[in-house]
């Protein structure tokens, strides 16, 4: 893949099947296709049922069933990316697949930076670590993080992606 193809990549929002190990399988396959998948993940300690003072660490998706994908549709056609059984579809706004504002993804990467949880997006996570968020951007992302119900976080994400300029994110999509 040459540098021109790397420069023409955009972030898109897509959905995946959450059953079993589908996320890991899909992300591994997308990495093989030279596409960068990423979703905000966190680890939480869950008390074990068989012991009073033991915990397990579990990985949870902030937006279950949703992920961001960095791709150039001239190189990786949409139909080729939809081939994996865990890939549901791209999120459409106004009936079409639209790029997500890069600042939104960078802001989320700044808040959820763990490269161990997302090894395929290591370069993008490193780049996002040096950005600065405005007060409005940070407050909206913090509001999403503090929302307990995943369904509510997903609706806040969809609102943010469709109306980025109303939440402090400048429209900079080509």
Each model region followed by its residue ranges:
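Acidic-enriched and Gly/Ser
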Residues: 2-174
């Amino acid at each position: 893949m040459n540098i021109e193809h790397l420069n023409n990549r955009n972030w898109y929002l897509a959905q995946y099947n959450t059953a079993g190990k589908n996320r890991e399988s899909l992300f591994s396959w997308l990495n093989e296709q030279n596409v960068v998948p990423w979703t905000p993940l966190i680890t939480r300690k869950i008390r074990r049922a068989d012991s009073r003072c033991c915990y397990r660490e579990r990985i949870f998706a902030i937006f279950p069933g949703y992920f961001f994908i960095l791709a150039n549709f001239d190189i990786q056609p949409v139909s080729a990316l939809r081939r994996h059984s865990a890939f549901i579809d791209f999120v459409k706004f106004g009936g079409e697949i639209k790029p997500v504002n890069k600042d939104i993804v960078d802001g989320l990467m700044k808040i959820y930076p763990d490269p161990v949880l997302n090894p395929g997006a290591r370069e993008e996570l490193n780049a996002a670590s040096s950005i600065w968020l405005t007060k409005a951007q940070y407050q909206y992302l913090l509001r999403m993080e503090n929302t307990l119900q995943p369904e509510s976080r997903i609706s806040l994400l969809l609102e943010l992606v469709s109306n980025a300029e109303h939440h402090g994110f400048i429209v900079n999509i080509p």
